[in-house]
């Protein structure tokens, strides 16, 4: 896989209450990824960026909600999430990533 493509696959870590609970319980980290990212690409990107070993990747697509803004109807964007399970002894510290 192209290293340039792998650098663009992961958009941002997801730091929510649910994602933190999953991280503590299942040793998984949640990321927002591009819409056309595949599981092997996500695995390779996490291993390249964070220098950790990935055990598995679970992906979900979330459809954007329709929201009203006064009399105008708008829509939030669709989102693709990846839950990355790390091998035993591996950990990602977002404070040290450059």
From Swiss-Prot:
GO molecular function, one term: structural constituent of ribosome
InterPro entries listed in its UniProt record: Nucleotide-bd_a/b_plait_sf, Ribosomal_uL23-like, Ribosomal_uL23/eL15/eS24_sf
Protein's GO biological process: translation
Alphabetized Pfam families for the sequence: Ribosomal_L23
A GO-annotated cellular component: ribosome
Protein family (similarity comment): Belongs to the universal ribosomal protein uL23 family.
Subunit structure: Part of the 50S ribosomal subunit. Contacts protein L29, and trigger factor when it is bound to the ribosome.
Role noted for this protein: One of the early assembly proteins it binds 23S rRNA. One of the proteins that surrounds the polypeptide exit tunnel on the outside of the ribosome. Forms the main docking site for trigger factor binding to the ribosome.
Name of this chain's protein: Large ribosomal subunit protein uL23
Organism: Bordetella pertussis (strain Tohama I / ATCC BAA-589 / NCTC 13251)
UniProt lineage: Bacteria, Pseudomonadati, Pseudomonadota, Betaproteobacteria, Burkholderiales
Gene: rplW
């Amino acid at each position: 896989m192209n290293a340039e493509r792998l650098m663009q696959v992961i958009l941002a870590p997801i730091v929510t209450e649910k994602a933190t609970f999953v991280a503590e319980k299942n040793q998984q980290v949640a990321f927002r990824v591009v819409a056309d990212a595949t599981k092997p690409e996500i695995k390779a990107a996490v291993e390249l960026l964070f220098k950790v070993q990935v055990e598995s990747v679970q992906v979900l697509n979330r459809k954007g909600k329709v929201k009203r803004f006064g009399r105008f109807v708008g829509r939030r964007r669709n989102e693709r999430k990846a839950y990355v399970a790390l091998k035993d002894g591996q950990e990602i510290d977002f404070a040290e990533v450059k």
